[in-house]
Amino acid sequence: MNIMFCGDRGVCQGIFLSALSICKNIIEPINFYILTASVEGHQPITQEFANKMELILQTKNNQHRVILFDISDRFQSYLPLANMNTRFTPMCMLRLFADMVAEIQEKVLYLDTDVLCYEEFGEMYEMDMSDYEIAGVPDRYGKWFFGNALKHNYLNSGVLLLNMKKIRETSLFEKCREMCRDRKMFMPDQTALNKLARKRKIPSRYNNQGDMREDTVFKHFTTSFRFLPRFEVVTVKPWQVNKMHDELGIFEFDDIIEEYKGVQNDEQRDSDLLYN
């Protein structure tokens, strides 16, 4: 099984938490791919972090692997110039370079770093993707405003099953990179994927963007809106433990949080968002 994360040094905590939650629910060997890059304002993830994460994960299965790819040179050649001065975070675009990493073969499950696994997902991972480039869940809010509002086919890109073989055949990611470079868009990487990809829609339990449900497989800690008693924008990430408890009423991942705490040394605790 192949899992992919992307980002800079600021998301290491999210990657580690997500990986721990996956290993709790999947017993087979997993390749965890991490794509990172050095861009102005962003420090790349270090090999030291990847090595430590692999060492911890191998206590659960000694065949788990963590493979770090620094794609700074390739990223610089496709900088999303049209979107660099927007709210867009360029690190989100790193996943669109997976086709340029030869080691990432066949099928890979991409996860945002604020996604935690709650149940086993083998059935989803093994679904037939022969006719599709990507599979995902409709975006909780975007499905009403983008794509086909009747079909709800505008996907949230936080959990995506990627058919890398087909993506390379169709040059999907190359087309998306060019679109992000040349055209100013709202959430450019997600918009480009939705516009250009041949996509398969899957049940919402595989990317639950709302309240926890009994059938939740992946919980995605996205920004949400509350309308009563007053309008409020709510953004809570899984490493914000008190807010996760008090504002979201989510306690289902406390064992993962405690495990994460247990593998940090004192120096890391002092600099870790979880403790600040």
Show where each model-derived region lies.
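Catalytic core and acceptor-binding pocket of nucleotide-sugar-dependent glycosyltransferases
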Residues: P138-R140, Y154-V234
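Histidine-anchored nucleotide/phosphate-binding helix
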Residues: C12-I27
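A conserved hydrophobic helix/loop-capping motif in glycosyltransferases and polysaccharide synthases
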Residues: I3-D8
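GT-A fold catalytic core of metal-dependent nucleotide-sugar glycosyltransferases
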Residues: S72, M91-R140, Y154, L161-L162
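C-terminal catalytic/acceptor-binding lobe
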Residues: M212-N276
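Short internal beta-strands
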Residues: N31-S38, G136
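Active-site-proximal specificity loops/subdomain of glycosyltransferases
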Residues: T46-M100
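Short, flexible/disordered intra-domain loops and linkers
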Residues: S38-E48
